[in-house]
């Protein structure tokens, strides 16, 4: 190639390939290895995922993606969603197609069609296999915006027309075809449908078009796909376990919460068992915050729109709020609060503060309201009314880093006590410079504050990812996220750096020279939303909570009804010691009562009969070790009180009962 202009392709391992002419990604993959090319799903060029058919004509970094890569697997699944849509329209020509992306655990496609039964899904799977067996190549082509609209109008696909009409004038629209079926899509996709080796359609449900209850209700089919049948089998087994742990099912079975249509979506009823758990969590969090220097506030559930106009929520978050009144007709318009911060600012402003008074740490167990779309509602994880341990720290600039780190330490302590510290990921949520109207403040302030948070996380040796566009409108934040049993990630705890709202609310302190200075603010949750935390714990422990959180901690089981009196005396002493206890005095067989207690996830059973009554003892059975032998009643009370006080998480050694 001497004397010729060459294109240099830098591969993932740092090696380089030189070409004298433009080259498709798939051809470069074959140059590397035929095995790699056969396994390839897509390419990653300078960080952007592209089709294998993409032609490269300039120097770049290239990574060949296979289904072993998360991004490569997403491409495979996206193609599987197209094959599913083709199969649906082959079998049900009247079905209109909407959207069909890949997701963390597979893929889905939305159809304007009546709900699909399990038998329908099985038939669609068979049709997909026929399509895959034919092995059609996948081709990409483009049309002008006008031609694309005309194309889908002719095919009577209104959802595709709407999507295209939302795109700018003059936009070039990309399509993908496989055989005689074509879809609107940005891609990328596999080279051929033959690349789909193992897939399964999982379920069908309802979903609003574009996630808004104002739009048409569609039918969504969920599926998943993997590179091999063994991987698919493993995933399906995990899904079965996920269904068993799903808080939406288990939480209802355990009488922790329920929902009622006439009350409304996203408005769960917390049952007595759930209230016990929430109260335990609240007492613990509030006591811990008090130890760490917080003082508590109690502020209104609503405020005039004027408050939210000062804070910026009216301009940046109004669509997520429940507004009471009409600005055009009413003298005063109110809104239920979506967060507590502006209220606590006025608690701070009620007095003048010296630099010596800071930091001031304000905590509140708040009830908040957010107008989530109906399509987003799910059990306890996404609701319209929720409870949260919220806090705002008003600090001097020189105190900001230490206090922010202390907030991270409090969050980590909470995670450790709950036994979930290994289950979370940390995210630096940043602003999006390309979407400045979403935020307040100057770019240099955002860059500086994001830099401070990045440095802190690095100093604390916390692995984290950076997420552009996920910041609050007034500042960057650390989000601590966890996945539910189905792999969907939710934010559990948030800690936000705010260098802007103190000025909005004219907050100040008096420095050592007698001058007014602006404080900084930290917005934080110590444990996050109680409802979402309950969902998380239900799924984490499959309802087998640490004893201190169990709605019922001990069940006394007399071996026959004639020992009910002694059982009730044992229960009374338990309750006197602050232990949640009941007696099963029914005339059922012992084995039945023990099994039922285990199914109801009671951690300790105390069996009492003649010997126990005579000696003032109890025979202890636990879900941890099974038979733990006979113990003095006082000894057992001391033991379980210590376990509850220390919030011990005991390892379960015995096999769980199954319903």
Residue ranges and their predicted role:
Residues 2-96, 103-659:
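NTP/phosphate- and nucleic-acid-binding module
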């Amino acid at each position: 190639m001497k004397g010729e202009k060459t294109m240099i392709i830098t591969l993932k391992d740092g090696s380089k390939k030189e070409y004298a002419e433009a080259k498709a990604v798939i051809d470069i993959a074959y140059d590397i290895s035929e095995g790699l090319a056969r396994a390839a799903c897509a390419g990653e060029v300078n960080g952007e995922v592209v089709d294998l058919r993409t032609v490269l004509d300039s120097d770049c970094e290239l990574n060949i993606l296979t289904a072993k890569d998360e991004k490569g697997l997403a491409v495979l699944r996206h193609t599987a969603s197209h094959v599913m849509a083709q199969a649906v329209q082959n079998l049900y020509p009247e079905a209109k197609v909407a959207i069909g992306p890949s997701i963390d655990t597979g893929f889905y496609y939305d159809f304007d069609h009546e709900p699909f039964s399990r038998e329908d899904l099985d038939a669609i799977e068979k049709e997909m296999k026929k399509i895959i067996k034919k092995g059609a190549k996948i081709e990409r082509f483009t049309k002008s915006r006008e031609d694309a609209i005309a194309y889908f109008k002719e095919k009577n696909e209104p959802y595709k027309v709407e999507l295209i009409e939302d795109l700018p004038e003059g936009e070039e629209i990309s399509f993908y075809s496989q055989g005689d079926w074509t879809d609107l899509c940005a891609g990328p996709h596999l080279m051929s449908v033959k690349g789909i080796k193992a897939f399964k359609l999982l379920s069908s449900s309802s979903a609003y078009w574009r996630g808004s209850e104002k739009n048409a209700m569609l039918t969504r089919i969920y599926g998943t796909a993997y590179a091999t049948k063994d991987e698919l089998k493993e995933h399906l087994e995990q899904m079965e376990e996920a269904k068993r742990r799903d808080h939406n099912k288990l939480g209802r079975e355990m009488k922790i919460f329920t929902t009622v249509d006439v009350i409304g979506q996203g408005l769960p009823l917390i049952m007595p068992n759930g209230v016990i758990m929430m109260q335990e969590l609240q007492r613990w969090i509030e006591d811990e915050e008090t130890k760490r220097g917080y003082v508590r506030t109690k502020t209104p559930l609503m405020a005039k729109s004027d408050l939210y106009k000062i804070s910026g929520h009216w301009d940046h978050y109004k669509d997520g709020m429940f507004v009471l009144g009409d600005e055009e007709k009413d003298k005063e318009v109110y809104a239920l609060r979506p967060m507590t911060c502006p209220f606590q600012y006025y608690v701070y402003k009620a007095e003048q503060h010296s630099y010596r008074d800071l930091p001031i740490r304000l905590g509140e167990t708040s009830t908040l309201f957010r107008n989530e779309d109906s399509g987003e509602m799910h059990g306890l994880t996404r609701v319209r009314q929720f409870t949260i341990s919220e806090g705002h720290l008003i600090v001097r600039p020189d105190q900001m880093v230490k206090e922010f780190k202390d907030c991270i330490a409090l969050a980590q302590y909470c995670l450790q006590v709950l036994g979930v510290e290994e289950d979370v990921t940390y995210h630096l949520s940043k602003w999006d410079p390309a979407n400045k109207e979403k935020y307040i403040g100057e770019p240099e302030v955002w860059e500086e504050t994001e830099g401070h948070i990045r440095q802190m996380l690095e100093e604390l040796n916390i692995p984290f990812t950076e997420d552009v566009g996920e910041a609050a409108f007034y500042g960057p934040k650390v989000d601590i996220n966890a996945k539910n049993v189905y792999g969907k990630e939710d934010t559990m705890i948030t800690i936000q750096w705010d260098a802007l709202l103190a000025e909005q609310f004219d907050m100040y302190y008096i420095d050592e020279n007698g001058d007014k200075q602006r404080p900084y603010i930290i917005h934080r949750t110590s444990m996050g939303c109680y409802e979402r935390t309950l969902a998380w714990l239900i799924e984490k422990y499959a309802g087998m909570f640490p004893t201190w959180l169990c709605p019922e901690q001990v069940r006394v089981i007399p071996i026959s009804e004639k020992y009910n009196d002694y059982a009730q005396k044992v229960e009374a002493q338990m309750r006197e010691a602050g232990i949640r206890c009941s007696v099963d005095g029914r005339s059922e067989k012992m084995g039945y009562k023990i099994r039922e207690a285990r199914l109801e996830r009671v951690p300790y059973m105390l069996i009492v009969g003649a010997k126990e009554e005579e000696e003032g003892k109890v025979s202890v059975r636990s879900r941890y070790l099974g038979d733990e032998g006979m113990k003095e009643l006082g000894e057992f009370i001391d033991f379980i009180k210590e376990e509850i006080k220390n919030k011990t998480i005991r390892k379960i050694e015995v096999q769980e009962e199954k319903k």
